[in-house]
Regions:
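ATP-dependent small-molecule kinase phosphotransfer cores
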Residues: 2-78, 89-92, 127, 134
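Short, hinge-like loop/turn segments at secondary-structure boundaries
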Residues: 17-21, 100-103, 179-180
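Conserved phosphate-donor/acceptor-positioning beta-strand/loop module used by diverse small-molecule
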Residues: 57, 76-100, 111-116, 162
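Alpha-helical scaffold elements adjacent to nucleotide-binding pockets in ATP/GTP-utilizing enzyme cores
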Residues: 68-72, 96, 119, 174
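Arginine/glycine-rich "motif VI" loop of SF2 helicases in the C-terminal RecA-like domain
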Residues: 72-78, 102-108, 152-154
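Cys/His-rich short segments
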Residues: 94-136
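NTP-dependent small-molecule kinase module
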Residues: 123, 127-181
Length: 181
């Protein structure tokens, strides 16, 4: 599992050149420019631990990124098996993300109801980009930049749509089934 968000947050925390460039976009809820993300993902996808397959989380987010991914995978002679759309009502997304909390110690994702991390007992905090204004801006950016990927992957006969408004265990089971796991 490769999460562009995790990679970018680590780059910001470590103040790498990419992290410094990306921070302003992330804090505003904007997409990090395609060229930066494509370079980052190309470097990561070429690592030996991805040879048997990988789940990409947060990439691609634009049609330009999708075309770049197609090129990368063709060069590596690897197929793209599916593009999952976990479909959730925008107001549900706002509620979920603004109540999301993360453990400072182990990175466990929890909710505002968790006073301490259920995994390790560490302190829970709200990520800077999980405030309502930033979440709503991210949804606007999604509509403009990422939603066109639905038609792109439908046209490639790779789109698998999953109803994300259900219990997490049911959604997870559907994701596993869609991926053949």
């Amino acid at each position: 599992h490769i999460s562009t968000g995790d990679i970018l947050r680590a780059a910001v925390k470590n103040q790498t050149p990419l992290g410094v460039k990306a921070k302003g976009f992330m804090d505003a809820g904007e997409l990090v420019p395609d060229d930066l993300i494509i370079d980052l993902m190309k470097e990561r996808i070429e690592q030996p631990d991805t040879e048997k397959g990988v789940i990409l989380d947060g990439f691609p987010r634009t049609t330009t990124q999708a075309v770049a991914l197609d090129t990368m995978l063709a060069e590596l002679k690897r197929p793209l098996n599916a593009a999952l759309l976990i479909d959730v009502d925008f107001e549900v997304i706002v509620k979920r993300l603004t109540s999301r909390r993360m453990c400072k110690e182990c990175g466990h994702i929890g909710s505002v109801a968790d006073a301490a991390c259920p995994a390790c007992g560490g302190e829970m905090y709200q990520r800077d980009d999980d405030n309502e204004a930033t979440v709503r801006n991210r949804l606007d950016v999604y509509e403009k930049s990422t939603a066109p990927l639905i038609d792109y992957y439908r046209g490639c006969d790779l789109l698998v749509s999953i109803d994300g408004d259900r219990d997490v265990d049911v959604v997870y089971a559907d994701v596993k089934q869609a991926l053949g796991l």
